[in-house]
Amino acid sequence: MKLKKNIFTIGATVLLLSLLSACSSSNNSSNSTDTAGNETTAKTHLVTDALGHKVEIPNQPKRIIGSYLEDYLIALGEKPVAQWTVGSGSIQHYLQKELKDVPTISYDLPYEKVLSYEPDLLLISSSATVEGGKYEQYSKIAPTYVVKNGNDVTWETQLKDIGKALNKEKAAEKIITDYQKKVKATRQELADKINGKTAAVLWVTNNSAFMVSETRSSGRIIYGDLKFGVPNLVTEISKSATSDWSAVSAEKLAELDADYLILVNSDEKAAMFNEATWQNLKAVKENHVLEFGPESSWLYNGPIASQNMVNDIKNNLK
């Protein structure tokens, strides 16, 4: 009986150890599965874009197309696989140090061309780009994220949104903070040149003049950030503006009484520069014209463009 009892005890012990071992193996297997699942999940993150699409984006995308968002991508340390162009090869010249080897893609993002670049992420700068079923087409190629856009959306808002999409929100915040510090320092350094002075930004192309709106594009930099005064003509034109730049007739241009004129000159031989209307402008007569070419950043938006514009003002007025 004693022998049988010992055998029973040993058998029970072996059975218990076997059960514990099985449970342990099961737990390890479960843990391994969970870990593998977590690792898989960690490779992507889910975000909601400007149009309400829930988009699963790689944490570290390698082949991004962000047409007309290259400024933001470069600022965040990303190099796209293709860059924006329009018309007969117009590109963002001020970004070419970083994009010189990057091929171009038309602003309207032709499907076959997009497909040929094998992107792993598409960032869309305008809701209109994906109308008419195009979003569904693009999303078959790669995760497609429509960035916040519209006339009232600032570059800071767009940068934060792109930062969210790229899992680089802290980097986006730092860029904005650094820009604000630069603006503050520039205002202080140029206080005697800015305080009480007005300025206007004028783009001349094809012998025609266009004025930037008070709250858009470079207008935000000049008036909102650097705090130059707003000339009456700029205020008037801004009220009816439907885009960043509004056409200005020669008759209206004659009313411009800005202390400083920031000229974005895309037509150096424009006849208007020799006309009385131009020669009689206050800023022209006082030699307060700051001239920049079309390859500068003054026609664009974004963190790099904005920093460049602040630097341009600082370097020309200090």
Q: Which role fits each region the language model picked out?
A:
Residues E118-I124, P143, L253, A258-D259:
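Proline-aspartate-enriched helix->loop->beta-strand connector
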Residues D49-L51, V102-E112, S240-A250:
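Short helix-initiation/N-cap motifs at beta->coil->alpha
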Residues K2-A12, A22-Y68, A171-L202, N265-K269, ...:
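Bacterial Sec-exported substrate-binding components of ABC uptake systems
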Residues S88-Q92, M211-D244:
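Alpha-helical, coiled-coil/dimerization segments enriched in small aliphatic residues
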Residues I65-K113, L121, S126-S127:
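A short, structured surface patch at a secondary-structure boundary
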Residues L256-K318:
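Structured C-terminal subdomain patch of bacterial secreted/periplasmic proteins
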Residues K140-N207, S296, Y300-K318:
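Extracytoplasmic substrate-binding proteins
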Residues L17-L20:
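Bacterial Sec-type N-terminal signal peptides, specifically the leucine/valine-rich hydrophobic h-region
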